[in-house]
Amino acid sequence: MPRTARNNNMRSNGASIEVAGVIGTGASKTRKKMRDIERLLKKDTLPAHVRVENERALKALGVELQNTQHNLKAKQNAKKYHMVRFFEKKKAIRKLKQARKTLEDTASTEVRKDIKKARKVVKHSEVDIIYVMLFPKTEKYISLYPNPKEDDKTELSKNPKAKKGMQMTEERKRELRKQAERLLDENKLPFSIDDVLQGKTIRLDDTQNHAVLTEEIDAPSKKYNDEEEKEDDFFE
């Protein structure tokens, strides 16, 4: 085999190896590799098998970039909304404990109407906890217990755009609460509510949809790798 042909084959065969070396290195390097491949694909003289190989590599890198951006956004939101979720979780736990105590006391009276009402309050409180625990980390956190000020109400009445934004926020909150309630009704929660009430720290693995008893909301906020954040500055 002529040396030139052999070298061409080596370069084409090495494309997948080069892509593998980019996986997990961050969004900046992934985007750079994608631009390199896109420039290569613009060449009219590119052999068919090399073109196919690089088109596949480009698609794979596109998926990798999406995953990297998703994880980065989740990390940033976890840090940004750590305290508000921490306090709302504590408040939701307190409300559920009170609701369960009320149900227990009401059950002893044997008044069916009161018992039914108490059960609804318990379920509502359980949904609150699920909402806080499973709120998508890639989204801006929507508070369960907001404290609207008079100035805010006045601003909403004067600003149609702000009012529409608030309506969309409330709609999203209702949607997420319905999802939480559905998981509760279908017994598909990735964690135990009793574990939450007992103070066990739960880290949720979003990719695998299961829970691991380790640090999560209750853990102190950690400092993230500055170099990684500087490199992956897509959301800054």
UniProtKB/Swiss-Prot annotation:
Compositionally biased intervals (Acidic residues): 226-236
BP-aspect Gene Ontology terms: maturation of SSU-rRNA from tricistronic rRNA transcript (SSU-rRNA, 5.8S rRNA, LSU-rRNA)
Record field: compositional bias (Basic and acidic residues): 148-158
Swiss-Prot/TrEMBL keywords: Coiled coil, Nucleus, rRNA processing
Compartment(s) where it occurs, according to its Swiss-Prot or TrEMBL record: Nucleus, Nucleolus
Coiled coil region boundaries: 53-110, 161-189
Pfam families to which the protein is assigned, alphabetical: Efg1
InterPro entries in alphabetical order: Efg1, EFG1_rRNA-proc
Predominant location category: nucleus
Region ranges (Disordered): 146-176, 204-236
GO CC entries: nucleolus; preribosome, small subunit precursor
Family: Belongs to the EFG1 family.
Entry function: Involved in rRNA processing.
Name used for this protein in its record: rRNA-processing protein EFG1
Species the sequence originates in: Debaryomyces hansenii (strain ATCC 36239 / CBS 767 / BCRC 21394 / JCM 1990 / NBRC 0083 / IGC 2968)
Gene responsible for this protein: EFG1
